[in-house]
Amino acid sequence: MATKKSGGSSSNGRDSRGRRLGVKKFGSEKVIPGNIIIRQRGTKYHPGRNVGIGKDHTIFSKVSGVVYFRKGALNKTFVDVLEVNSAS
């Protein structure tokens, strides 16, 4: 009798989910303290005025204001939060 053992299932065919990185608040958007502005791996964007950086390089707002992106020395991109006057 000619028989053939059935093939086993492949050990491939899986992948991990995306990490949801990127810019969360774009330029001219309003933020409050603690808002995450960018989630990133490494410092593609650097912290500027009124923002902090977490241990996983997440950039977050320290004050209420408006997000502003600018180019600095050596073509680095900095993220600032510019405080808006509450008098208006």
From Swiss-Prot:
<dbReference type="GO" id="GO:0006412">
    <property type="term" value="P:translation"/>
</dbReference>
<dbReference type="InterPro" id="IPR018261">
    <property type="entry name" value="Ribosomal_bL27_CS"/>
</dbReference>
<keyword id="KW-0687">Ribonucleoprotein</keyword>
<feature type="compositionally biased region" description="Low complexity">
    <location>
        <begin position="1"/>
        <end position="13"/>
    </location>
</feature>
<comment type="similarity">
    <text>Belongs to the bacterial ribosomal protein bL27 family.</text>
</comment>
<dbReference type="GO" id="GO:0005840">
    <property type="term" value="C:ribosome"/>
</dbReference>
<dbReference type="Pfam" id="PF01016">
    <property type="entry name" value="Ribosomal_L27"/>
</dbReference>
<keyword id="KW-0689">Ribosomal protein</keyword>
<protein>
    <recommendedName>
        <fullName>Large ribosomal subunit protein bL27</fullName>
    </recommendedName>
</protein>
<dbReference type="GO" id="GO:0003735">
    <property type="term" value="F:structural constituent of ribosome"/>
</dbReference>
<dbReference type="GO" id="GO:1990904">
    <property type="term" value="C:ribonucleoprotein complex"/>
</dbReference>
<dbReference type="InterPro" id="IPR001684">
    <property type="entry name" value="Ribosomal_bL27"/>
</dbReference>
<feature type="region of interest" description="Disordered">
    <location>
        <begin position="1"/>
        <end position="24"/>
    </location>
</feature>
